[in-house]
Amino acid sequence: MYCAKLILLLGCFWISSSASDPADPLLVDLPNGKLRGRDNGNYYSYESLPYAEPPVGDLRFEAPQPYKQQWTDTFDATQPPVLCMQWDQFIQGDDKLAGNEDCLTVSVYKPKNSSRNSFPVVAQIHGGAFMFGGASQNGHENFMREGNLILVKISYRLGPLGFVSTGDADLSGNFGLKDQRLALLWIKQNIASFGGEPENILVIGHSAGGGSVHLQVLREDFSKLAKAAISFSGNALDPWVVQQGGRGRAFELGRIVGCGQASDSVTLKKCLKSKPASEIVSAVRNFLVFAYVPFTPFGPVVESPDAPEAFISQHPVDIIKSGKFAQVPWAVTYTTEDGGYNAALLLEKQASSGRELIVDLNDRWFDWAPYLLFYRDSMTTIKDMDDYSRKLRQEYLGDRRFSVESYWDLQRLFTDVLFKNSTEISLDLHRKHGKSPVYAFVYDNPANTGIGQGLAKRTDINFGTVHGDDYFLIFENIVREPQLRSDEEIISRNFLKMLNDFVLSENGTLAFGTCVFQDNVGSSKLQLLSITRNGCENLELESFP
């Protein structure tokens, strides 16, 4: 049904070669009317363009509806996108509420480049654990300096507003993923009006954005929306992406906000629709065991097969094994110390005791580990959960205690369980069951400051190459210093050329600098590109290092 609807919508393309006025490039004509953007020196921006009706009132907890309003006046596209309502880990203090429920927009950034009439397109899905973040969380000055690509940033519903689910057809969940998909359809239909090439669209994302990109790829009709995709440090098999236990969390959410009498999904949904969005989102604090743990209490789920417009109704592993996913070139990545998110927060010194949280793990490991590493709802019994916790501790720390001195072993555990292992599994499954090229790289080149220092609130620890150290060379982020080192400047330009060449490649070839990625499909071994400050190297492996 969803696929049929997509084909119908794609059949109604509204593409006009004269949609942008050559005499006034800030003025763009869309089916909804005219809009005016901003001149930023070396690029134009057209921000906060609605692609869906506001998901409020009766449209809360429903699949997004295409935006149909007509503008009688010229739409002001100079306003930066608002955050979707969220409980933001990176806001200091107890009140972490931010954003607005009416937030479903895309923002378009077009180079000033008189040497070409049209541009390939990169669509970005932001990260933030499916709980926070936004289209404006990453900058785009590095990206736009090359002048070769149009960038489109997507906003989508987050946290309980985007992902609460009772596991049945009545409150199916995955609303944020459905938002992303409708935004991709909007881009396909409208980007030509901005000078974009609808036949050359690359979709990328980092962390939860990377997991989102992979989930989009796992829909067969994604091939009608994009030409290729890259998932940076996040994929559909990461244990924090698609989780179990959603129904219990949905009814617990209802109890917290005053829907305690709801005994079925229909009643719960009706009650939740009547509550202020701020109350629903603020209830996230009740699902956190300590600090911002677990970092994804609400995220993607496997929907009931009878759910209307279900996004996925099988586990990603089963979808990949079936071969019924989009056959487009896809790359998946990780960094050598990706687990710095969220392990680094355990090194923050507590105001009350003056000691680091990591010390408390010695007494709380069996309580906290299932939430830190996302196996609380996947284990059948408490004994299974405790046995796994014990196994992990023994494997990575042996008989040593948790301390600042043993932090790197804990961070290695986080990297393996939350990122690296599932990246290898995804790659292995795709090479066995896919037809289009599938690539992978590992990045090892620590930033001077990054997300590790931000979470730990200290600069005396070496965290290695943590979550985002590669992606933030493409899109600036406040967790690191804006000035790039000379080696990072080279890598940044190589990344941008990699994106440009990938989206234009007719056979799905991917290259970085002097290295051409090796395709994993049909390969007897894993093909992994290693990227460091000294260059790049193709590795052929039995398993990831």
Curated annotation (Swiss-Prot):
Disulfide bonds join C84-C103, C259-C271, C515-C536. Changing R533Q: In strain: JR-50. Changing G248L: In strain: JR-38 and JR-382. GO terms for cellular component: extracellular region. Changing L83T: In strain: JR-198 and JR-460. Eye and hemolymph. It catalyses: a carboxylic ester + H2O = an alcohol + a carboxylate + H(+). This is Esterase-5B.
